Regions:
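Active-site rim/loop-helix segments in enzyme catalytic domains that contact anionic ligands
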Residues: 1-98, 219, 231
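Metal-dependent de-N-acetylase/amidase catalytic core
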Residues: 1-4, 82-234
């Protein structure tokens, strides 16, 4: 299968679903990760132009650890919002390029505007990409595929309906997260937390819920034509 995970910033995917994506790669899937924005505002000291480059390199380093292709949509932080046609059209192109069998993205009820905007943009673009007469970079329309919403930060207001056992992938998940060195500093200085420890603890918590040592939780987008009778997550 082909899997597309779309996050707002570099590191969002590592936090919420990198264990699942690593497991997808292990079973033979092609996995593509897209960061819609550059993450250029996510630091206390490093200026945006410099941070943009740093975070792109951190994301590619993390993806390489698991054999994942990493691309960026090219927007900066807080430039993405849910009625932004430019952003929607860019995601249409990315979805057509990736040709996924399912998509993973943010939960629509999340803690910051870039996350909620991306959730809506992915919902809109995944349908728009299926329209043969909608003008875009790629001629062939995409398939209409299921969307899975990944966990929110610290699991706030998120009740999973599906779980993936990532016990064998937890060390890789944390290693991928730790590639984002700028964000470990940012979260410590901005939010006062040990980011890697928090993410591992949340994975442990989801594991308790489903009888695994470590797990990641998901909720499928339940709308007309996006349902499936198959288990797609690994």
């Amino acid at each position: 299968m082909r899997v597309l995970a779309i996050g707002a910033h570099p590191d969002d995917i590592e936090i919420a679903c990198s264990g699942t994506l690593a497991k997808c790669v292990k079973r033979g899937d092609t996995v593509i990760v897209c960061h819609v924005s550059s993450g250029n505002l996510g630091h206390v000291v490093i200026p945006p132009d410099e941070l943009r480059v740093i975070r792109a390199n951190e994301a590619k380093k993390a993806g390489a650890l698991a054999g994942i292709e990493v691309i960026c949509a090219g927007f900066d932080d807080l430039e993405i919002y849910d009625n932004n046609k430019e952003a929607r059209d860019k995601l249409v192109d990315i979805i057509k390029y990736a040709n996924p069998d399912f998509i993973i993205t943010h939960n629509p009820d999340d803690y910051m505007p870039d996350h909620t905007a991306v959730a809506r943009l992915v919902f809109d673009a995944s349908f728009t990409a299926t329209l043969p007469n909608y003008e875009s970079k790629y001629k062939e329309p995409a398939k209409l595929v299921p969307i899975y919403y990944m966990d929110t930060l610290a699991g706030v207001n998120f009740n999973p309906t599906e779980y993936v056992d990532i016990t064998e992938e937890i060390d890789l998940k944390i290693e991928m997260l730790e590639c984002h060195e700028s964000q470990l500093v940012w979260m410590r200085e901005h939010d006062g937390i040990d980011f890697a420890d928090m993410v591992k603890t949340c994975s442990r918590y989801r594991g308790y819920q489903c009888g695994a040592e470590y797990a990641e939780g998901f909720r499928q987008c339940q709308v007309y034509l996006k349902g499936t009778t198959k288990r797609l997550l690994p």
